[in-house]
Structures are given as structure tokens and as C-alpha cells.
Amino acid sequence: MRLDQIFATLFNNQPLTQEQSAEFFRAVVNGEVAPEQLSAALIALKLRGETIDEIAGAVTALLTAAQPFPAPDYPFADIVGTGGDGANTINISTASAIVGASLGLKIAKHGNRSVSSKTGASDLLSCLGVDINMSAENARQALDEIGLAFVFAQKYHTGFKHAVPVRQALKTRTIFNILGPLINPAHAKRQLLGVYSPELLKPYAQTNARLNREHSIIVHGSGLDEVAIHGKTQVAELRDGKIEYYELSPQDFGFDVKPLENLRGGEPRENAEIITALLQGRGTDEQNQAVAMNTALLMKLFGHENIKQNAEQVLAQLASGRAFDTLVKLTAY
């Protein structure tokens, strides 16, 4: 059996090819890998360090196995973070997705329940009255009509359930933590992706290149999986097959450095109140700045190159309260 060969390769500390990795993860989501085998394989991958081929193979397998989403022909993007930064901030990427859509961008936001913070994207949106389990057809209609869809990971990646007991028992990060942001079932070719460690910038950029993604901006902001208001943000930008590495500071967006403490979040209900106030034009300077900086880079994925002008536009949109209208419309689907 081919799986035996794959296990032998892993346990000899050798890397899998992209095809072998795809075959292994196909077997995982089909429930064909015993928990003991999966546990051993995940640890073998982790200790050696997952290669770009292994990550890309896993992504390909998981996207093929996912429940279908009717992806549109027009350009659209995803904005997502790895989580795991331990900072417990408000849901900046979810707020940025809503604001971006209110400015005319098309955003299919992939998200899940919280893993390490108190409030994940789906926890927050549920609290705000959004049907996170809406059908793929309804989500696509929302994307067409209001520029925003929420693509709930658990609904589309049903095969993940086979890995849950092992992941919970291992209590450590595995390749599954890396895969989450890469497996949007809508197959977004553009993405703003926040990572919990600067060491992940290069592998994510290289994996997105291997997967022929059009334009990805991968960020790590001084300890956050977001663009930072409190310090430097390291960036890996993939465009047309080329990867560029650079740093951004709040000044590049027209802002001063602000303390991170003022972005602390809480339980879902608490975060929902904060995000509602923010979208209605009642956010604090720090909250507005965080969303403006992240949305400014989201706009860059659609050809708006001047991030300072983008940030100004976002601040004006927040002050107007129009972003809240987009959220209200989303609750109707």
C-alpha cells in the first residue's frame, strides 16, 4: 500500500514529494489513517520541519476534498490570520473585511472558531447576527451583492473531523495550524495573511507561489498576526510569481506608533459590542488605526497602491458609519 511507503519515508526523516503529501492528506480526510499513525506522522513532520512541497500537497488535497463553493469570475480576496499570537486583540481582520467590502472590494473571508484567543471570526460574526452556516449559494449571493461572504471552515472541510482527536491530544502546533489560512474553499487567488511568527513569512509566500496564487501579502506585526500599530510590520509580498520582503511602520500609513494594550479584546459578546461601535464610527483612535492599516493593505491587493491614501479613505469610511450598513446587510442572508 502506498501509505506504507509514505510512512517509511517520514519515519526515515526524509521529505515527501508534493504528490505523496497530497495522497497522505487525502487519506487523512477520508478517515483512512489510524489515529496512532496520524499522530506519529504529524510529529515526524513537525520535528523535521514541513517543506513547501509537503504544505502545498496538503493544501491541494484539502481543497479538492472540501465541499464546493461556487467561486466567481471577478477578482476577490481573503483576509485571514493564523491566530496563535497570544495577544487576544479585537477581531481586526474581520472588521477589515467588512470595511473593505463597504468600500467596494469583494471579500470571501475564510474563518473558524477561536483556537487560542477568546473570540474567533465565526464566534464574533455569530454574535453580530450573521448566519455563519449559510449555504454556499447564499454566501456567493452575498459576495455578488454586498461584496462580502463568510466561508466557515468547519462547514466546508468536513474531513477535518478525522484529525480533531489527534490534534487535541497532541496539544502542540502541527502542519494543520499552517494549513488553515491556505485552504479557503472559494479558492481566493488574492490574500492578506497574518502570521504569528516572522519565521512563517517565507514559507507562506513560497507555498502561495507554488500554488500559483496571484497576489498575497503576508504580514507579521511585532508579535501580532496583523499589521502592527505598536511597531514594525514585516512583510512578504508575492505578486506575479515574485516575492519581495520589506518592513512597514505606522508612519508609512500616516500614523504614529500607538500602544497595543488599547486593542485588547474579550469574550465574543464584548468584541461584538466593540466592533459594532467601530463600524458605526464610534471606535477609539487605536481601533480605527488598526483597521485602517490592515484594510489599506487589503486594498493594495486590488490595485490601490498608495497605502497612505488607502488608510485615509478607510478612516473616512469608518467615521461615516457606512461600514455598519454592510454588516447589517450580511445578517439578512
UniProtKB/Swiss-Prot annotation:
GO biological process per UniProt: L-tryptophan biosynthetic process
GO molecular function, one term: anthranilate phosphoribosyltransferase activity
Binding site for Mg(2+) 1: S93, E226
Catalysed reactions listed for this entry: N-(5-phospho-beta-D-ribosyl)anthranilate + diphosphate = 5-phospho-alpha-D-ribose 1-diphosphate + anthranilate
Family annotation (InterPro entries): Anthranilate_Pribosyl_Tfrase, Glycosyl_Trfase_fam3, Glycosyl_Trfase_fam3_N_dom, Glycosyl_Trfase_fam3_N_dom_sf, Nuc_phospho_transferase
Protein role: Catalyzes the transfer of the phosphoribosyl group of 5-phosphorylribose-1-pyrophosphate (PRPP) to anthranilate to yield N-(5'-phosphoribosyl)-anthranilate (PRA).
Protein name as annotated: Anthranilate phosphoribosyltransferase
